[in-house]
Amino acid sequence: MNRQTVMENSMVPSTCARPIELYVFIDPLCEDCWSLQPLLRKLQLEYDRYFTLRIALRTSLPSMNLPCIQKNEDALACDKVHPTYPIIAVKAAEFQGKRAGLRFLSKVFEYSFLKSRNVSSFSVLVEIAEKLELDVDEFIRDFSSKNVLRSLQVDVYMAKEMEVDKAATFVFFNGNIEDEGLKVSGLYEYEVYEQILEELVGMTIIPDIPPPLEDLFQRFDVLATNEIADIYNISEKSAERELKKRLLQQYIERITFQDTTLWRKKQL
């Protein structure tokens, strides 16, 4: 498997602006993929100039063809539920822009693993689209469109070509399109991904200085205290102090789920 084969057959546009292409295969229902988010964000913040990130959804075509399940027989009250709905919904959100897709994916993780909501429910996915202020009518139309299914089929094809059989999986490609990709399945320490990136670039990579806290909340919707501490290489206590300053300034707001505290830009 090399990048030339994948790119020719998947019709995904390539770019030469950065030396590395990084494909990350994610399953919206996978807890490891949720845990991966802080690592991936930090990698983007520090080394974004070295790689182009492509998020692909890990799924399988047979499951896409299963009929939907209904919670009850009342057609007016029924809420359609199916395990493939979250994947379809992320793709539908992507049709409103790459960032919309990433924000939707993050919100699916939040609803599933923090709020314990059933993200396989169509009505819950529509609620997420509303929360993110997407065009909900467009989202619903795209959800059942052939274009979304074609986009998912591209991800399925890429996973097959890259021999990806689980999420989360990273696949790194260097500047030579004939070289094999380097596949890393599962979760590892941040330094492992740094080392791989450096080896593929072929020189010492220098991390970018993290942006001001306000800019961070412009880029990412929701962040945890420990994630912010890690990004700025400070203690959690120091991070919380800075966050509370912004809280008093009414720039951000705190949201708590059981024993987890998250922060986001204040909703108007």
Question: Predicted segments — roles?
Answer:
Residues 8-11, 39-41, 156-157:
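A generic local structural motif
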Residues 31, 62, 179:
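Flexible, glycine-rich phosphate/dinucleotide-binding loops
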